[in-house]
Amino acid sequence: MKFRAIVYNSATLNAPKNILQFLFGVVIYTSLTGDYNILKIVIAASGLSMGLGAIYLFNDLTDYEEDRKNQMKISWKAIANGSISVQTAKYLILILSILGTLFSFLSGTNFFVIFAAIIALNLLYSYPAIRLKSHKNSSLIVITLIQILKFSSGWFLFTNNLEGFPYPFVISLSVGYALLFLYYKNNTTNAKTIIRENKKRVYPLSLVMFLFLLISFFMYAFPVVFLLILGMSVPTILFYTLSKDYLGTKVNFAFMYAGLIIILLSFLLLSVPTVTATNDTLLGYSTQIKEILKHAYLNR
């Protein structure tokens, strides 16, 4: 195995993303309850990363011939570019599978069930005999479900109670991820062309995403988070648009990580007194708006 393959492979490059998605649930739970367990978080995050690392390498094995012809992917698809041999990849898949399963099992029943569901859905997506990734609609549904489970995993590491869990926001994030995934699968060549060719998927998913985002704004007690996300996302998206033409498609990874960090940072800022006070003020306005809408509906 070549030295560059330690970093430039699907398992390593996707590990930070999976950890950030896992930490989303942890941050939400901790911000609401104040409870956390560092050791449990580290073990669970390691288990999820290793288990998914095995899946990514398995996926690369099944896509070996296809990836060799893809100029966008070849630089970081270590099996396709020869940085990792097929035999080494098989050993890594076995080791990561065992360690990922063990660490996830040690993290508790709730987390292990979610871990098992994530792995099962990924196998449905990639396994040659099933290969749902070949079906346009089914693949997006599976990808969305996987993201819902990953964003939820950190929460259910500590509890099986849904009270306070922002599931509409999680659904919105997961659908948004599925849309970005569709963009990525088409090699990020031309957004307008991708939207036009996939409008039967893009438009309904976009509607679902914004609908659940709107529901989240009125249902949960952190409206300032949505404003922070919006405020930090606009310049990030602008920078992405300007830099993509100069840096190429590799900037997509940086943009994806920036988006996840923005979301986590926005929730973490709720611990700052000034931000908390602003959130309470916005929450009061939100309550007033809901009362006005309620009275308007009842007096029709």
Where would I find each of the regions flagged by the language model?
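C-terminal membrane-associated helical module and adjoining short loops/tails
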Residues: 3-8, 12-15, 148, 153-300
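Membrane-interface helix caps and helix-loop-helix hairpins in membrane proteins
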Residues: 105-106, 129-137, 154-163
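Topogenic membrane-insertion module of multi-pass membrane proteins
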Residues: 1-72, 81-94, 117-121, 125-126, ...
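Multi-pass membrane catalytic core of lipid/isoprenoid biosynthesis enzymes
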Residues: 64-116, 171, 199-222
